[in-house]
Swiss-Prot record:
UniProt xrefs under CDD domains: SSB_OBF
UniProt keyword list: DNA-binding, Plasmid
SSB domain: residues covered: 4-109
Biological processes per GO annotation: DNA replication
One annotated Gene Ontology cellular component of this protein: nucleoid
Quaternary structure and partners: Homotetramer.
Region annotation Disordered: where it falls in the sequence: 109-136
Stored InterPro entries: NA-bd_OB-fold, Primosome_PriB/ssb, ssDNA-bd
Name of the molecule in the record: Single-stranded DNA-binding protein 1
DNA-binding as UniProt keyword: yes
Annotated Acidic residues bias: 127-136
Length: 136
């Protein structure tokens, strides 16, 4: 049976991107992207909103573009796939996270200073061995 793992977000960066490099030299950026849902409360008539934070990981050329052209508050469109991973931290605690592995990105909103690239696509966002994609 066929399946689909595709995420699409339009949101704002919660912090300035920080480019890091894997052992093989591949650039990577992990950012938190905020999305906000708004609705009218049917009992009070008040406008309500809820913000969700999404971890998004960029690799290679996409990571370089995000690191160079985006900053806290930048609005972006991201398309990618959900990936979950777990690990044991330095204190021995079992940790778990779910992230969006970005395959496409488009900058939205106001034009940033030095913003020369409007959208980008990365044909193979993950390294060949996914188990190694966080080795720094």
């Amino acid at each position: 049976m066929a399946s689909l793992n595709k995420m699409q977000l339009i949101g704002n960066l919660g912090a300035d991107p920080d480019i890091r490099y894997m052992q093989d030299g591949t650039p990577t950026v992990t950012v938190s992207v905020a999305t906000t849902d708004t609705w009218k409360d049917k009992d009070t008539g008040n406008k309500e909103e809820k913000t969700e934070w999404h971890r998004v990981v960029f690799f290679g050329g996409l990571a370089e573009i995000v690191g160079e052209f985006l900053k806290k508050g930048s609005q972006i469109y991201v398309e990618g796939a959900l990936r979950s991973r777990n690990w044991t931290d330095k204190e021995g605690n079992k940790r778990y996270t779910t992230e969006i592995m970005a395959k496409e990105m488009q900058m939205l909103g106001k034009k940033q200073d030095n913003n020369k690239v409007g959208n980008a696509r990365h044909g193979d966002a993950l390294p060949a061995d996914e188990d190694d994609y966080y080795d720094f």
